[in-house]
From Swiss-Prot:
Its EC number is 7.1.1.-. Its main location: membrane. It is a peripheral membrane protein. It is found in: Cell inner membrane. NDH-1 is composed of 14 different subunits. Subunits NuoB, C, D, E, F, and G constitute the peripheral sector of the complex. Keywords: Cell inner membrane, Cell membrane, Membrane, NAD, Quinone, Translocase, Transport, Ubiquinone. This is NADH-quinone oxidoreductase subunit C. The keyword Cell inner membrane applies. It comes from the Bacteria. The keyword Translocase applies. GO terms for molecular function: NADH dehydrogenase (ubiquinone) activity; NADH:ubiquinone reductase (non-electrogenic) activity; quinone binding. Belongs to the complex I 30 kDa subunit family. It comes from Neisseria gonorrhoeae (strain ATCC 700825 / FA 1090). It is an enzyme of class 7 (translocase).
Length: 197
């Protein structure tokens, strides 16, 4: 636990006011910063000799519109990065809140961490978060003609359109979703008959 406290103090000392909030909880350090400080925070964490978080392990978008089964009062979208210092054997999380809920935009960290390239494309594709100065921001998991962003909490579970092969046209076509609701009755297995006994 002493190393977590040392890391906490080092991060607070290095980042200063750029880190909006530094949280130490459950044996982990989380840095929450504003979008205008995001690049400088990530650069400091990467380059500073006392920190040296040279590896971006993960970057993802988060939609907080409903959080813990209730309406969320803060910003809707955040980008969360998990960083690793191989040299110091330490991990840190960075959360940046995106300013605009209607058109979420944050700066790209692909110039600092090469691995951010595809992670940012995934966050763009699934959450609609735009990354300024990204070298190749385009969809990575859904079709190019896909409408919407499927990991947003307001996206319908069934989607908007479905794709199928049309024998007459000899090509793949899109059509509105045609899912018929049905009642599903669960099969109940009684303990006394379980396993054929």
């Amino acid at each position: 636990m002493a190393s977590i406290q040392n890391l906490y103090e080092t991060v607070v000392g290095v980042l200063g006011d750029q880190a909006g909030k530094v949280i130490s909880a459950l044996g982990e350090i989380t840095v929450e910063c504003l979008p205008e400080h995001y690049i400088s925070v990530m650069t400091a964490l990467h380059d500073h000799e006392d920190l040296h978080f040279e590896l971006l392990v993960d970057l993802c978008g988060v939609d907080y519109s409903t959080y813990k089964n209730e309406a969320w009062q803060g910003k809707r979208f955040a980008v969360v990065s998990q960083l690793l210092s191989v040299k110091n054997n330490q991990r840190i999380r960075v959360r940046v809140w995106v300013s605009d809920d209607d058109f979420p935009v944050v700066e790209s960290v692909a110039d600092i961490y090469n691995s951010a390239d595809w992670y940012e494309r995934e966050a763009f594709d699934l959450y609609g978060i735009m990354f300024n100065n990204h070298p190749d921001l385009r969809r990575i998991l859904t079709d190019y003609g896909f409408v919407g962003h499927p990991f947003r909490k307001d996206f319908p579970i069934s989607g908007y359109v479905e794709m199928r092969y049309d024998e007459e046209q000899k090509r793949v076509i899109y059509q509105p979703v045609t899912i018929e609701p049905r009642e599903i009755t669960p099969r109940i297995v009684r303990e006394e008959n379980y396993g054929g006994q």
